[in-house]
């Protein structure tokens, strides 16, 4: 089962985290579910984030990417693939 790992970083430490089941290509829905569970606003997803996520399976959102104020420094998301298939990094 593939998962999306959502981390809320404050002062260079993981303040909160959530693992959400996530098939490849459904990261927006999984991120929305994680944001709801963590009770944080949904970030603005830019082309920069899409490119980073597709290339590295990882991206980060800072306070510039949220409409509302946030109680953390940044949100990092990472796709964890447990299917055994290797992706080129």
Regions found by a protein language model. Name each.
Residues 1-19:
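Short, extreme N-terminal segment that most often corresponds to the first beta-strand
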């Amino acid at each position: 089962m593939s998962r999306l790992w959502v981390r809320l970083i404050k002062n260079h430490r993981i303040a909160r985290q959530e693992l959400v089941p996530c098939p490849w290509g459904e990261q927006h829905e999984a991120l929305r579910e994680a944001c709801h569970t963590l009770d944080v606003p949904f970030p603005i997803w830019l082309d920069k984030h899409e490119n980073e996520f597709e290339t590295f399976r990882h991206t980060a959102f800072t306070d510039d990417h949220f409409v509302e104020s946030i109680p953390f420094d940044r949100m990092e998301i990472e796709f964890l693939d447990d299917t055994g298939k290797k992706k080129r990094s």
